[in-house]
Amino acid sequence: MARIAGVNIPVNKRVEIALTYIYGICRDSAKRITKEAGIEPQVRVSDLTDAEVAQLRDIIDNNHTVEGDLRRQIAMNVKRLMDLGCYRGLRHRRGLPCRGQRTHTNARTRKGPRKPIAGKKK
């Protein structure tokens, strides 16, 4: 198995698809990376040489924020919003949607399961 950015890349998949197993790399980014490395996107990971894997690793390490660094950066951005006390920060703090969705009904994913209120009947 090829190991790039601390992630074991599946050997039996095409390079373009296998790179998406890394957090922070989507199909579009994977296409750009393979083009920059000069590797055909249809090639299987098992057919890559060690030099090509090293080249992919270098491109990803130097040009992309991935895995733990990206997760940390996102968490710091959310924490900064919460510390500022802006509307988006308050919504994050309360666990509610922060992009304008309705919350009277729906928003169950963000709010979690319903909490029953004792003594309340229709």
Curated annotation (Swiss-Prot):
State whether keyword Ribosomal protein applies.
Answer: yes
Q: Please give the biological process terms from Gene Ontology that the record holds.
A: translation
UniProt entry keywords in alphabetical sequence: Ribonucleoprotein, Ribosomal protein, RNA-binding, rRNA-binding, tRNA-binding
Q: Does the keyword Nucleus apply?
A: no
- What domain of life is recorded for the organism? Bacteria
Recorded GO molecular functions are: rRNA binding; structural constituent of ribosome; tRNA binding
What GO CC terms are in its UniProt record? cytosol; small ribosomal subunit
Region listing for Disordered, in residue ranges? 96-122
Function in brief = Located at the top of the head of the 30S subunit, it contacts several helices of the 16S rRNA. In the 70S ribosome it contacts the 23S rRNA (bridge B1a) and protein L5 of the 50S subunit (bridge B1b), connecting the 2 subunits; these bridges are implicated in subunit movement. Contacts the tRNAs in the A and P-sites.
Family affiliation? Belongs to the universal ribosomal protein uS13 family.
| Classification via NCBIfam families | uS13_bact
Oligomeric and partner information: Part of the 30S ribosomal subunit. Forms a loose heterodimer with protein S19. Forms two bridges to the 50S subunit in the 70S ribosome.
Query: What is this protein's record name?
Result: Small ribosomal subunit protein uS13
- Give the organism's phylogenetic lineage: Bacteria, Pseudomonadati, Pseudomonadota, Alphaproteobacteria, Magnetococcales
